[in-house]
Amino acid sequence: MVKEFAYRGIPKEELDNMSLEKLFQLFNARQRRSLTRGITDGKRKLIEEIKAAKAGKLKNPIKTHVRDLIILPYMVDVTVNVFSGKEFRPVTIRTEMIGHYLGEYVITNRKVSHGAPGVGASRSSLYVPLK
């Protein structure tokens, strides 16, 4: 048996039909505050592109630098390429992501693995014979 996703006890079908005001009441205070303060031009453009992609009107993949957009139910099943600071990483929005920020799913830093120090990196390495 497959477990159905429910956001705060409400199934996805009801979330799709719910008005934004009722949906905002389900979110945490941080998400509510972000959504009620208004939508910037960058977020508005991304929302329009997501709606066009859902309708099948968009040919190119969606690329964005907007990481602070809160995922809403109508954005589910869309792939968005989010900028990580170096490259665009694809994020396919799933139902479990509703209410989270888009940037939470693209890590901006990674573990650095340094190689061996080169010649002249320190005073003692000057006397190491070259290979």
Swiss-Prot record:
GO function term, MF aspect, one: structural constituent of ribosome
Alphabetical GO biological process terms: ribosomal small subunit assembly; translation
GO CC terms, sorted: cytosolic small ribosomal subunit
Keyword set includes rRNA-binding: yes
Keyword NAD carried by entry: no
Listed PANTHER family: RIBOSOMAL PROTEIN S19P FAMILY MEMBER, SMALL RIBOSOMAL SUBUNIT PROTEIN US19
NCBIfam families: PRK04038.1 (NF003121), uS19_arch (TIGR01025)
Physiological role: Protein S19 forms a complex with S13 that binds strongly to the 16S ribosomal RNA.
Family, similarity comment: Belongs to the universal ribosomal protein uS19 family.
Name the record gives this protein: Small ribosomal subunit protein uS19
Organism of this sequence: Nitrosopumilus maritimus (strain SCM1)
